[in-house]
Amino acid sequence: MSKVAIIDFGSQFTQLLARRIRELNVYCEIFTPDVEFDLVKDSKAFILSGGPKSVASLAEIPKIVHNIIELNKKSSIPVLGICYGLQLLSNYFNSAIVSDCSKEFGKATLNIIKESEITKNVWEVGKRVDVWMSHADSVYNVPRGFEVIAYSVLKNVIAMICNEERKIYGMQFHPEVYHTTDGIALLSNFIKIAGCKTDWTMNSFLDEQQRVIKKQVGDKKVIAAISGGVDSSVAAALTYRAIGDQLHCIFIDNGLLRYNEAEKISQLLVNQFQMPITIVDKSSVFLNKLKSITDPEQKRKIIGKTFIEVFEGEANKIGGVEFLMQGTIYPDVIESGGAVGKESVTIKSHHNVGGLPDVMRLQLVEPLKLLFKDEVRLLGKELGISDEILMRHPFPGPGLAIRIIGEVTQEKIKMLQAADDIYINLIKKYNLYNIIWQAFAVILPVKTVGVMGDSRTYGYTCALRAVTSSDGMTAGCFPFGVDTDTKLIFYEFLQEVSNAIVNNVDGINRVVYDTTSKPPATIEWE
């Protein structure tokens, strides 16, 4: 099986880059810059990722870059540098790197000035294309032995270079990000240049993970953290296929679930999997520990720690349990700063990862931690899981606690459950649910004055969020648009939702819609 080695210098997009390579049915692994070179020297190609550091301030080029270039000199093994990776390659080949003067973030337009194997049948000379930039440093002059493929139109920055003879390529932009035009096609060309076999599939991943789980667990018992979401459901189905009745499924009602969630999910999972599921109501425990807590990181860590404590308690009741299964996926790990490359910057802690206590009495089984959400759904289809589960919108482990900005109270939970239920039901009514990546309501810590029935009100503000995405790493505001059957337009839909919430949910007198993309915002508010 062909392998592409990605050297991770700390980019938030590194795991997404790996996803894009696997999407091309090519196996890839991610390594830190201090990896022993013997572990990666048999790769078919190397990709140097982006990263938050500045090449301009580096004392010396990392040893791994020297080793890769030396190997390339002997064998012409293809090398691709992205953003920071481009700057490392350029600096190695005697180009100056300058800081700040030509920084670009977000959408940028390129002018293609040269043909190349990596742009073959994708971009023609003279074409202008939109890409996604995220850099403060720039390559000042053309590296020795290289030619420029493209410049940034606005800043006239070197955006793409090549040394065709040695099969070394560099991109200042991020081809792996959804918003880069033809980014996947560029990566596909790089894979072709490397001569990689396209034989890695979700079916092969399924087979391999079953072997991994069996080897890790042996004949020991596993307790499964079931939430009813896509991730935990697929993880449970995969683990159950691997070890059968050694798996014990537990559904924790933490009091932070959506309206009637516990009842709906338990019925759905039992019908789908025919596995016994124990429902444990610990809502009072979670709510008591969250009392007076307003900081989102504290909330996440408290919920994560309590989550583990409860599961350890349930494991003790079963007896002989040594493993805890969780539905952790790649974006959870990335945003917690716990990706394979440890140089990335933490965005937020996730209850499955950043909130775990340092010392645990249960070992973790995380069969999905290498997959993105869309891959998880593909794996679910391989496992025969119904669309009713697979197409559910993502729901965070900390639940409504991070959709209530500020202190979590029973009053706010009830308000949010009711408002969110109205919003989602109207989305489903107009057949929008399956084309929206994620939609939810948020209770803000802001009260505003209103008038209802000739009386003054002073109620909470509810924010609505709906986004489009393919992987959860970048996201845009869902525009609603015009439904061809109902002719419902953006404003009319939001007005219907707003009226329904204000008229039916006590305590809310104002509704707003969040139009912010990711980045700069995250999808969740906390």
Swiss-Prot record:
Keyword Ligase: yes
Substrates-to-products reaction catalysed: XMP + L-glutamine + ATP + H2O = GMP + L-glutamate + AMP + diphosphate + 2 H(+)
Positions annotated as active site in the UniProt record: 83 (nucleophile), 174, 176
Residues that span the membrane, as ranges: none
GO molecular function annotation: ATP binding; GMP synthase activity
Pathway listed: Purine metabolism; GMP biosynthesis; GMP from XMP (L-Gln route): step 1/1
Protein name listed in UniProt: GMP synthase [glutamine-hydrolyzing]
